[in-house]
Amino acid sequence: MAQKERGERDERDGEFVDRLVHINRVAKVVKGGRRFGFAALVVVGDQKGRVGFGHGKAREVPEAVRKATEAAKRGMIYVPLRSGRTLHHDLEGRHGAGRVLLRSASAGTGIIAGGPMRAIFETLGMQDVVAKSLGSSNPYNMVRATFDALKHQMHPRDIAVQRGIKYSILQARRQHLVDAEG
């Protein structure tokens, strides 16, 4: 595999949207004093259901962001969206002391989420969602907890297969519940 020259861009770069979530200045104590560096947390998505996050460390901010972006592209996941705009069902995710609750929302609700979660939903292409962060407000824990929840998102067809029932029956039950709420 040939190495890419510095400054060359991958052809797929145009289809991804990236958001810088957090930059942290870190220090390493050495004999001559402190040596400073930077750690960056970046979220990358195609706004069509694929999203990933990455962590990069370097002596300079742009290099840390570049490394984080590359890591995010390597670790992307696919999240099935209902009508291309919201979740199929409510979710809960955990990581460390961080806990997030994600709820599907009706059309026109928008993204109601704080901090790092908003960046994830925007890059994912989600338009309507309500999210609540409980516990740790550390951006790393919030991002990982959100990804934990999104990994457990299942399409209703997969749920129907697991339960051994027809998709149309599951869909009819859901519509009955929606009509009862309305």
UniProtKB/Swiss-Prot annotation:
What are the GO BP annotations of this UniProt entry?
Answer: translation
Which UniProt keywords are present, listed alphabetically? Ribonucleoprotein, Ribosomal protein, RNA-binding, rRNA-binding
Q: Name one GO molecular function term.
A: structural constituent of ribosome
Q: Which InterPro entries match?
A: Ribosomal_Su5_D2-typ_SF (IPR020568), Ribosomal_uS5 (IPR000851), Ribosomal_uS5_bac-type (IPR005712), Ribosomal_uS5_C (IPR005324), Ribosomal_uS5_N (IPR013810), Ribosomal_uS5_N_CS (IPR018192), Ribsml_uS5_D2-typ_fold_subgr (IPR014721)
| Source species, domain of life | Bacteria
Q: What does the function comment of this entry state?
A: With S4 and S12 plays an important role in translational accuracy.
Subunit comment for this entry? Part of the 30S ribosomal subunit. Contacts proteins S4 and S8.
PANTHER family from the UniProt entry: MITOCHONDRIAL RIBOSOMAL PROTEIN S5 (PTHR48277:SF1)
- Describe the family membership recorded for this protein in Swiss-Prot or TrEMBL: Belongs to the universal ribosomal protein uS5 family.
Q: What is this protein called?
A: Small ribosomal subunit protein uS5
Q: Which organism is it from?
A: Bartonella quintana (strain Toulouse)
Taxonomic lineage from the root: Bacteria, Pseudomonadati, Pseudomonadota, Alphaproteobacteria, Hyphomicrobiales
